Amino acid sequence: MPPTRFQPSHQTPFKSTISTSQQSRIFHSPLQAGATANPVSISISDIDPSEWKYHAEGGKNVLLSFDPVGGIQAGKSPFATLTCTYALRIPKSLPSKSESNQEDEQEAEQFTRHVVQPLLGDATVLPKCMRIPIVTARDRHVIDMLSARIEMQRPAARRTHPARIRSEALSYIYAVEDVAAPVSVSPSAQRAVLCVEIKPKWGFLARIDSIPPSSPNVEIKARYSRYRMHRVAKHAAADHAGQMSIEQFERLYDPVDLYSCDSERKQKAIKALWDDWIDTKGKTNNLRLFWNGAVVDPQDSVTLEAIAQFLGTDNSVQGRLKGALTQHLDKELSKRVLGENDEWSTVSVLSRLAHLQSALDPLDVEGLAHLWLRRTQSHVLGQASSDVDLPPALTRNLAAAQLAAMLDSFLSGTTAEVSLEDAVQAFLVSASFKDCSMLLRFHQTESGVQGETKLVDLDSKPFAKLSSMQQTDSEVCAAFLAWLSQLDRSPAASVAP
C-alpha cells in the first residue's frame, strides 16, 4: 500500500533552523564537553557521595544536588565554579536492562544535538551538561553508594516502581547546570537566586481541519485548551464531591494565555498558576519555586518574605509578592532571545515552543489515528497486525540524524505533502516540546533583578507511547463532553495566542 498523504493547510510563522543553525561550542544538555572559555574536567573520582542529596526525579532520571559540608564554595570542587554549579543527573533503568544502555544514552545525546538544539535555534537556552564516563568497578561502587544514600528520600511511589538507578546498566552519568543554585561571585561569596519552574503545556488550539469531521471532539478541541480539558477530566476522576463549576473552570490556568504576546493575558495566566500553587499547597505540577536551590513551601512565610525583599516588595501586604513576581515573570517570558533564519529578528522562548508544538502536530492525534487506520486497519495508533508490512518509521523512533532532515518540511513550508511516516515521527517530537519545563532564574545585579530562561525535560518520547497518547486524548475529551452536557451554559472559550 502506498504511503498515506496529507496536505498541511496552515501558514508557518517562521522557517525551520534545522539546516542553518550553528551548533554552540559550549556544551549543553546532554552533550560531551567541547571547547569552552573555562573548560572543566569531571570524573567519578571527584564525587564524594556524602556531598550529594536527592533533588527530584522523572520517569527517566534522578537529579541530585550538590550539598557539601560548609556550603558551596566556588573552586573547592569541579562541581562548583564561578560560572556554574552542577547537579548530577543519573539515568534510571528497569531490571531487564542489566547490560549497559550506552546506545540509548548516545541516542539521547544525538536527539538533543541534531533535533532539539537546531529547532530551538540557540543551544544556550539549554542548561550546560557534561558526560561523566563510568569505567571501573570503583566507579560503579560510587554510583551504588549515591543510590543507597538517596533511596529513602525518593517519593514512595517512585520507590515502588522497578525503574531505579542501576550502576551495572550505566555507561555515563551527567553533570548538569543547577539553574536553581545560588550564583557565585567569589570563592566564598554568593548571590541569592530565585528559580521559578513553569511547565507551560500546550500553547495552541487544534485546527478544525486537522480532525476527522466524524469526530465528536472537533468543536471542543478548537475552542478549549487541552490543559483545561485535562483538568476537568482529572477532577471528575478524583474523589471530589460534586463536579467542577463553570467559575472554577474559568479561573484555571490557561496555557494559551501564557503563550500570548498580550501582557495582560500573560499576567492572567501567571496569577492563575500562583493561585493554583497556593491552593494545592505547592503540589501543583505546573509551578514550583526554588529559593537558593531549595524548593519553596507556599506556607513558609519566612522564605516568602525573603523572596519578597529580593524582588523589592513586602509580603506582609496581601498580593504584593504575587504582583511583583508576576511582573518579573511577564518581563522574562516576553524577552525575544531566540533568533530566526532572519538574523535581524528574534522571538521569545514561548513563541518558539508554541510554533514547534503546533507545526509538528498538524493532524492532532485523532487525525493521525485516522490515517493510521487507513494504512494498517488498526484502530490503535502505533500498533498493527504482524502480517502488515510497515517501514521503520511506523514501528519505532527514527535515529536523530534521520529526524533532522525530515522535520524541515514541517517547519519551512517548502513541501506540500508529508507522508504518514513523517507525520508520526514529527508528532513524537512535538510531544517533547509539549511536555518540557521552563526554569526562569533571577538574581541581583548592580542594575537590579536580572532573569534568564532555560528549558529542561526535552527527552524524546518513545514510539510505544503513541497508543497511550491516543487513549488519554479519548478519555479527556469524553470526560469534558460529559461535563459540558451537565452545564446550563458553555464556559468561556480559550483564545488562541
Swiss-Prot record:
Record keywords: ATP-binding, Kinase, Nucleotide-binding, Transferase
Domain of life: Eukaryota
GO biological process, alphabetically ordered: inositol phosphate biosynthetic process
E.C. number: 2.7.1.158
GO molecular function: ATP binding; inositol-1,3,4,5,6-pentakisphosphate 2-kinase activity
Residue window of motif EXKPK motif: 197-201
Region (Disordered): 1-23
InterPro entries per UniProt: Ins_P5_2-kin (IPR009286), IP5_2-K_N_lobe (IPR043001)
Catalysis: reaction(s): 1D-myo-inositol 1,3,4,5,6-pentakisphosphate + ATP = 1D-myo-inositol hexakisphosphate + ADP + H(+)
CC per GO annotation: nucleus
Pfam family, one: Ins_P5_2-kin
Enzyme class: transferase
Family per record: Belongs to the IPK1 type 2 family.
Protein role: Phosphorylates Ins(1,3,4,5,6)P5 at position 2 to form Ins(1,2,3,4,5,6)P6 (InsP6 or phytate).
Notes concerning its domains: The EXKPK motif is conserved in inositol-pentakisphosphate 2-kinases of both family 1 and 2.
Protein's name in the database: Inositol-pentakisphosphate 2-kinase
The species this protein was found in: Mycosarcoma maydis (Corn smut fungus)
Taxonomic lineage from the root: Eukaryota, Fungi, Dikarya, Basidiomycota, Ustilaginomycotina
Gene: IPK1
